[in-house]
Each structure stands twice: as structure tokens, then as C-alpha cells.
Swiss-Prot record:
The gene is sdad1. InterPro entries: ARM-type_fold (IPR016024), Sda1 (IPR027312), SDA1_C (IPR048292), SDA1_MD (IPR007949), SDA1_N (IPR012977). Its main location: nucleus. The keyword Coiled coil applies. GO terms for biological process: protein transport; ribosomal large subunit biogenesis; ribosomal large subunit export from nucleus. This is Protein SDA1 homolog. Belongs to the SDA1 family. Residues 226-248, 485-545, 564-587, 601-682 are annotated as: Disordered.
Length: 682
């Protein structure tokens, strides 16, 4: 057994490596022998660095594996590998170069090499024309920095590494600069380097002359944080209880269609207020970390105006500028005439340009700056000579612009656009109704009387503020309900109200049974609607200044404010239906769905339908019955062989010669039947 090849340690490095890891001291001599062998191979390699050297490759990996066992003997080993790579990385054979890098990565994972020295070497190696090597180094850099900050953020090390990354971003080699940018973006997305310093360095990539670096920087700011998801399940118990109380209150009366409609409207208002109450989450926090967004957007616009990049890159720059202007509410008046030039129905990617126009609008922009943009959209898109889809997109874009800058809409243009509510195209009709619904909330007085819908207490209070006007209130709106509730409690000590099946019941109303304080609050709010507005403001101011409000008080105020949106205004009955809109809550950013929303899917032409049908037939099997085998890889059965065998080989077979044939009588009957059948069909 002693003569077996795998027990010869000098030539069997894996076995020696295994034994050394178990007992390093016992195999020191064998290790030193291999180390001397490695040094001699290095000398040979220096004379022919471009040749493949399998022995050197195996020895390097062996020493990297056992490096932690002999720290003194291998103290110069990492530096020696680093020098070899720095001096010969351009002429090294690709596999040997990869082996050297993997050995250094292994030593770094064992904390035998400092990250700063290794980072400088690896960024130097990124200049090599070796895609696999670049991918390996990129993965290691990201993973290594992640591991450094695994337990806690190592600010001292991060500062050193960040400064090195920032210098590499300005490197003359585009490959090294691009990978340094990719590393910073990846580390930001992993919440490792998510500080303002990193974000502001990435902004410099948006002015790079290298298109790939420019696009990577733009994509970073146009992305979205993955963690910011709308999760309706994360609502608080208070909000859930309010909805349950609302359901209980409206279900205690008769089950009439009138009660059902009131319940649906109340639930819509409740959902709307919940979304308003939620803590604001930013769609992408990187845009908020930019130190000087005004200067950044001005430089981007200047670069865009003189840019010779592809149209797709220009669109990305326009999107980023519009987001900066909209989110930070910047003054960039030259951007609107620039966008206005592209607002034509035949323009390529016109919906994205309309999105930019809407996103860059906000309430601090003077109305006379936005008004030409709206008129251009109306004149070029919302005309009868265009198709229904084009008109729909135009009205949707105008609606989104006006929602952010209401003063830019003139009353005459609004009257013209609302006339499309009776258009023959369903999509145009729904878009016009959406615009009407928007102005019912913003300023109903701008609509014609028949378009204002059923007035509510909330719509009576709605008005558009003048440009630059701020509404500073010295009271909490809705606080008067607390004073009214106090007076009600004094009158009715027991807190119960008699529920009688009287006129209200016959009229189809529900019975007011008190299940919680929310019901009391809603009824008190309904009574307060008959009080003059000035008196209510005075009561609210008195309550706001004379007592400390608790969480329960704020909840009562919130319920009362919601009741204003559900109930009719005093003396007003229901004359016509409200326009139901399926609008989503407007967030910080717009999406293309808001511009391209079509309520009715357009008909496909014949070519599109045929292509869809043919695409669905690719994986379909033939309409023939195939006797499948239990095992598809099994051999052919004897029955199948007999069926497929050549007849000339089978004619002298006993089975063929003794085969039973039809008798003369059977042939007569078959002939008679066939003749009768032919006669029958004549």
C-alpha cells in the first residue's frame, strides 16, 4: 500500500494541503519543500511571463490555501503576487492571471491582506481586456465592502475606500471608471454606502463624455427604491377599527340601494384620508440627497441643449430634469419651451415627453410659464382630426399638469375640454370626466353649473389659492366638533339615543344605533353643517387655544372632516350622480400609466390578431392520437416491428399464407350493401 501514487506527498498537493490544515507543525518540512519549488517556478516564469505554467498555478493555490498556517514563512507571499500582477498583468496568460487573483481573494478572505492595497491592484487590473476577470473582480469588491460593514459601519475604512472610488471615477480609462460607478451604485442599493457623499459623486457621472457612464448615472437617478412598496396590510389598528365601525353603522338600517351607495362613498373617503395620513415616503431617496439640485438641473439642461447623444439618452436626461424640477420645486423656466418643441402627436416617444411636461409642473411655477405648454397640448392633441387615443393622451396630460399647477388652466379652455364628455369615443369621454372630477375637488366654480355635481361641505370650502398665496390658519380645521360634542353630552347624559322606526326608517334611512364614538362624531358633524361658517371658525379657534388635544380628539376631528365629504351641503339634495373616477393617489412621481390610461382597449387589426393566433400555436401538439410509450427511451415493441416490416420479407410467412380471407358469401353481402348505399344517395 505504501507504493500507491496518492500517498506520495510531494506530488499530491491536495492531500498535503488536507494534512497541513489538520496538523501544520508535523508537515513543516513538506511545506518548505513546496515553497522552495514555488520560488524556483517564479524565477522561471519571469523569463517567460506569457507562457502557461500549470505547476506555478497549482503551487500558488496551494500556498493560498495553507497561508494561515504559516504566517511567518508566507509573510512576503501576498506582496510577491501583487508585484507579479502589477508588472506582468498585460502579458500574463489569462488563466494564470485569474489564478493569481483568486489566490489574493482567498488571502483577503482570511484577512491576510489589507483591503486598500488589494483595491488599488484590482482597479489596475480592470484595464485588462478580460471580461471574466473584470466580472470576478467586481463581485469581490462589492462582497468585500459588504463584509467590512456587516456588523457595523466601518466609517474609517469606508472613507478611505470611498475616496479611492471617487478618484477612479475620474480615471482616463473608461472601463475602470464604469466599474467604479457600478460598484458605488450597487453599494448604495444594498444600503451600505447610502450617504449624501456617494450620491453627489454619482452626479458627476451624469456629465461624463463616455456614453455608458452617462447612461449608468442617469439610470441610477431614474430608478426607484425597492423597499418602498405600497402595502395596505400595514395599516394601524385605529384605521381598521374606523372602517369596521363605519360598516357597522351603515349596516344596522334597512338594506336599501341608497344606504349601500352611502356606504361605498364613505369607504372611498375613508381610504382617501388614510392615504393622506400616511407618512410620506419618497419614491427614490437619492434625488433628495443632492446638495444643489438647482445647479445640477441647470447644468443638465445646458448639456441637453447641446447634446449629440442618441434620442433615448436625451429622453432620459429630460426625465431626470423633470423629476428634479418637480420634486425640489425648482425654477427652470427654459425647460418648458424646450419640451414644448417636441409636443406633437407624431413625435417619437411623445408620451414620455408629455410625462416630463407634467412631472416638471408644480405650484411655484408662474401660471404664464405653464399655460403655453397646456395650450400646445390642447391644440396639437385634443382636436377632432386626431384619433381617440391621441385625444385621450392629450387630455390625460393636461389633467396631470393642471393637478400640479391649477392656476395655469383658463376657464375658457376648461369649458372646451369638458365638452368632450359627450364624445363618441369612450376613452375621450372618461378622460374628460376625470378632468371634471379633478376640478370638482380643486375649484368647482370654474365648471359649468351642471358639471359641478352634488355639492358637499368639503367642496364648498375648496378654492384655488392665488400665485404665492399661503393659507396660515390660527385654528385646527374641524375642532369645533369637540365643543359641539361637549354640549351634546351635557344634554344627553346616558349617551344613548332612542332608535325609532319612524319617518327616517320609512324613507329608507338607517337607524342610528351608537356602536362607538365615531358614530357620535359623524352625527355631530352633520348637525354642525347648518351653523354659519364664521361661527364654526370661531368655535374651532376657541377649542384650539383653550385645551390640549389628545389622540382621541384628533381622531374625532378626522371623522368629522370625512363626514363633510360624504354628506350633502345644507339645503342641497341629490340632483345627479357623481362621476366615479378610478384615479390612483398621486405620489411623488408620475408614471406612464397616468398619461396612457385607456379605459377601453382599442381593436386590433387583422395582422395583429393573426400574429397573436400564430404565436399561440407554437407549443400546441398535432390533433392526432399518438400512442405514447410509458418510457420514451424504450426500444420498439414486436408488434410495431411486425407492422413496419417490409412485405416482401413477410409474404412467405406462415401467418400471411394462412391468413383468413372473406368467403364468397361475405363478398356478395358487401357488394349488395354498397349498391344499396349508392342508390340511396342518387
Amino acid at each position: 500500500m505504501s507504493g500507491r501514487h496518492n500517498n506520495k506527498l510531494p506530488t499530491n498537493l491536495p492531500q498535503l494541503q488536507n494534512l497541513i490544515k489538520r496538523d501544520p507543525k508535523s508537515y513543516t518540512e513538506e511545506f518548505l519543500q513546496q515553497y522552495r519549488h514555488y520560488q524556483s517556478n517564479v524565477e522561471i516564469f519571469k523569463h517567460q511571463p506569457d507562457k502557461a505554467n500549470k505547476d506555478l498555478s497549482e503551487l500558488v493555490m496551494f500556498l493560498a490555501q495553507v497561508g494561515h498556517c504559516y504566517l511567518e514563512e508566507l509573510s512576503d507571499f501576498p506582496q510577491q503576487l501583487t508585484d507579479l500582477l502589477l508588472n506582468y498583468h498585460t502579458v500574463l496568460e489569462s488563466d494564470l492571471r485569474m489564478t493569481f487573483c483568486k489566490a489574493l481573494i482567498m488571502l483577503r478572505n482570511k484577512d491576510l491582506v489589507s483591503p486598500t492595497s488589494l483595491l488599488g491592484l484590482f482597479f489596475e487590473l480592470l484595464r485588462c481586456h478580460d471580461k471574466l476577470l473584470r466580472k470576478t473582480l467586481y463581485t469581490h469588491i462589492v462582497t468585500d465592502i459588504k463584509n467590512i460593514n456587516a456588523k457595523h459601519k466601518n466609517n474609517k475604512m469606508n472613507t478611505t475606500l470611498q475616496n479611492f472610488m471617487y478618484t477612479m471615477l475620474r480615471d482616463s480609462n473608461p472601463i475602470a471608471a464604469k466599474i467604479s460607478l457600478d460598484v458605488m451604485v450597487e453599494l448604495y442599493r444594498r444600503n451600505i454606502w447610502n450617504d449624501a457623499k456617494t450620491v453627489n459623486v454619482i452626479t458627476t457621472a451624469c456629465f461624463s463624455k463616455v456614453t455608458k457612464i452617462l447612461v449608468a448615472g442617469l439610470k441610477f437617478f431614474l430608478g426607484k427604491d425597492e423597499d418602498e412598496k405600497k402595502d395596505d396590510d400595514s395599516e394601524s389598528e385605529d384605521e381598521g377599527s374606523t372602517a369596521r365601525d363605519l360598516m357597522m353603522r351603515y349596516s344596522t338600517g334597512k338594506k336599501t340601494s341608497k344606504n349601500k351607495k352611502k356606504l361605498e362613498k364613505a369607504m372611498k373617503v375613508l381610504k382617501k384620508h388614510k392615504k393622506k395620513k400616511k407618512v410620506e415616503v419618497f419614491n427614490f431617496s437619492a434625488i433628495h440627497l443632492i446638495h444643489d439640485p438647482q445647479d445640477f438641473s441647470e447644468k443638465l439642461l445646458k448639456q441637453l441643449e447641446s447634446s449629440n447623444e442618441r434620442f433615448e439618452v436625451k429622453i432620459m436626461m429630460m426625465e431626470l430634469i423633470s423629476r428634479l424640477v418637480g420634486i425640489h420645486e425648482l425654477f427652470l423656466f427654459n425647460f418648458y419651451p424646450f419640451v414644448q418643441r417636441f409636443l406633437q402627436p407624431h413625435q417619437r416617444e411623445v408620451t414620455k415627453i408629455l410625462l416630463c411636461a407634467a412631472q416638471s409642473s408644480h405650484q411655484l411655477v408662474p401660471p404664464e410659464i405653464i399655460e403655453p405648454v397646456i395650450m400646445t397640448i390642447a391644440n396639437n392633441f385634443v382636436t377632432d382630426r386626431n384619433s381617440g387615443e391621441v385625444m385621450t393622451v392629450g387630455i390625460n396630460a393636461i389633467k396631470e399638469v393642471v393637478a400640479r399647477c391649477p392656476l395655469s388652466m383658463s376657464e375658457d379652455l376648461l369649458q372646451d375640454l369638458t365638452q368632450y364628455k359627450s364624445h363618441k369615443d369612450k376613452n375621450v369621454v372618461m378622460s374628460a370626466r376625470g378632468l371634471i372630477q379633478l376640478f370638482r375637488d380643486l375649484n368647482p366654480k370654474m365648471l359649468t353649473r351642471k358639471d359641478r355635481g352634488r355639492p358637499t361641505e368639503s367642496s364648498k370650502e375648496a378654492k384655488i389659492h392665488k400665485y404665492g398665496e399661503l393659507e396660515a390658519k390660527d385654528y385646527i380645521p374641524g375642532a369645533e366638533v369637540l365643543e359641539a360634542e361637549k354640549a351634546e353630552d351635557e344634554e344627553d347624559e346616558d349617551g344613548w339615543e332612542s332608535a325609532s322606526m319612524s319617518d327616517d326608517d320609512e324613507d329608507g334611512e338607517w337607524v342610528n344605533v351608537h356602536h362607538s364614538s365615531d358614530d357620535d362624531q359623524a352625527e355631530v358633524a352633520e348637525k354642525l353643517q347648518s351653523i354659519p361658517e364664521e361661527e364654526r371658525k370661531a368655535k374651532a379657534a376657541m377649542v384650539s387655544t383653550s385645551r390640549l388635544l389628545t389622540q382621541d380628539d384628533f381622531k374625532k376631528i378626522r371623522v368629522a372632516q370625512m363626514a363633510k365629504e360624504v354628506g350633502n351641503a345644507p339645503g342641497k339634495g341629490q340632483k345627479r350622480k357623481n362621476v366615479d373616477s378610478d384615479e390612483e393617489e398621486r405620489g411623488e412621481l408620475l408614471s406612464l400609466r397616468d398619461i396612457e390610461r385607456l379605459h377601453k382597449k382599442p381593436k386590433s387589426d387583422k395582422e395583429t390578431r393573426l400574429a397573436t393566433a400564430m404565436a399561440g400555436r407554437t407549443d400546441r401538439k398535432e390533433f392526432t392520437k399518438k400512442r405514447g410509450k410509458l418510457n420514451p427511451y424504450a426500444s420498439t415493441s414486436n408488434k410495431e416491428k411486425k407492422r413496419k416490416k417490409n412485405f416482401m420479407m413477410m409474404r412467405h410467412s406462415q401467418n400471411v399464407r394462412t391468413k383468413g380471407k372473406r368467403s364468397f358469401r361475405e363478398k356478395q353481402i358487401a357488394l349488395r350493401d354498397s349498391l344499396l348505399k349508392k342508390r340511396k344517395f342518387k
